[in-house]
């Protein structure tokens, strides 16, 4: 019998009906204040709609998420007294979670504006293959590429 619970869908968000946006709102949420998190995310989408006229904010968000999400990462494994950094493919659920985490982290580190403006700026930069969260993804990919020699140690 499987010990792992079944996958629970979070359902769509209020405005777009998109499950990914709903997951992002949940990632932004602090202390169970979902309304505050939703307001921040939707305000960020409104700012994107203002600044990038003719662009759908949901499409900018999706493009940014695909640009931030890592494909490979390194995992530590101990082999014969030595610890190796082994490159491994990232599962799709973890890929999204890492993208949310990095976007939230690097948006918060931006200048002293509102959080919605910070998210909007980071999402627009990520959609254009720029920004700190995309640099983090590139750094993770470089680490995996540098340790390609240890790929045969896979779990």
UniProtKB/Swiss-Prot annotation:
InterPro entries, A to Z: Ribosomal_uS7 (IPR000235), Ribosomal_uS7_bac/org-type (IPR005717), Ribosomal_uS7_dom (IPR023798), Ribosomal_uS7_dom_sf (IPR036823)
Alphabetical list of CDD domains matching this protein: uS7_Bacteria
GO molecular function, one term: structural constituent of ribosome
Gene Ontology terms describing biological process: translation
Pfam families referenced in this protein's UniProt entry, alphabetically: Ribosomal_S7
Keywords: Ribonucleoprotein, Ribosomal protein, RNA-binding, rRNA-binding, tRNA-binding
GO cellular component: small ribosomal subunit
Subunit structure: Part of the 30S ribosomal subunit. Contacts proteins S9 and S11.
Protein purpose: One of the primary rRNA binding proteins, it binds directly to 16S rRNA where it nucleates assembly of the head domain of the 30S subunit. Is located at the subunit interface close to the decoding center, probably blocks exit of the E-site tRNA.
Entry-linked HAMAP family: Ribosomal_uS7_B
Similarity-based family: Belongs to the universal ribosomal protein uS7 family.
UniProt xrefs under NCBIfam families: rpsG_bact
UniProt name for this protein: Small ribosomal subunit protein uS7
Organism of origin: Chlorobium limicola (strain DSM 245 / NBRC 103803 / 6330)
